[in-house]
Amino acid sequence: MKVFVTGVCGQLGHDVMNELSKRGYEGIGTDIAPEYAGVQDGTAVTKAPYVSLDITDKQAVTKIITDIHPDVIVHCAAWTAVDMAEDDDKVEKVRAINAGGTQNIADVAKAIDAKMVYISTDYVFDGQGTEPWDPDCKDYKPMNVYGQTKLEGELAVANTLSKYFIVRIAWVFGKNGKNFIKTMLKVGKNHDEVRVVNDQIGTPTYTFDLARLLVDMIETDKYGYYHATNEGGYISWYDFTKEIYKDAGYTTKVIPVTTEEYGLSKAARPFNSRLDKSKLAENGFTPLPSWQDAVKRYIDELDMENL
């Protein structure tokens, strides 16, 4: 199986490429950088075939993917800077990447009859209430530019293809890039106490674990919408931080505050990021391990001196 992976200089793309290699599949990576610019950790992705590609360039997308002719496209590339996406001078670019780029990829996937995986987010919903979001819920109500453009990407895939997996995730962390765990470890190292919000609820997603599930998925034709965070229950960012510091051996005090007390961010954030993952097991997929286990494994692998 030949698999074309976008966004390999990011957290998830890096891990998907390594998982493909582990299983003996042919992975070809792409990102906008002239050459692979992710962490040089000696893993398979650092030596794998790589092509530079701007996904907003329809002509280039069509030519490169048609020439490679993969069986599957795993589309991890996206604009993910949620607050910066709100800037008036960025909205057009964010839409060009998250919606336009995704449409370009979906069009060529259809032309070559490839399966497509599109990574999405709980931000396509309004983030209110306490009920976990069902993967097949169509009550979309994005609360910011990032969520709106990721929803437009979802619709591009679903309206163009029949052989697709739309996989929503939340609170992502991985080896190859910035994330909440790395940020909190840096902050905790230099402060006696930190304030963290306790009224935004969800579950983290470890890209190493998610990559395994995504490759499991592309081995099947069980297409559709899925939610795929780690198991272990729903938590707040405050709970998450306490677990991070416990595993890292930090004594930093964590003080719970409300979103209102913490202060507004430029983009509105969801209070309810609970994602219902029951469809995974219903379709024969192995769910991800618990987030507690994932955090421990992740911190054990981190170079704490160079976060």
Question: Where is each model-derived feature located?
Answer:
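NAD(P)-dependent short-chain dehydrogenase/reductase
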Residues: 155-202, 208-209, 216
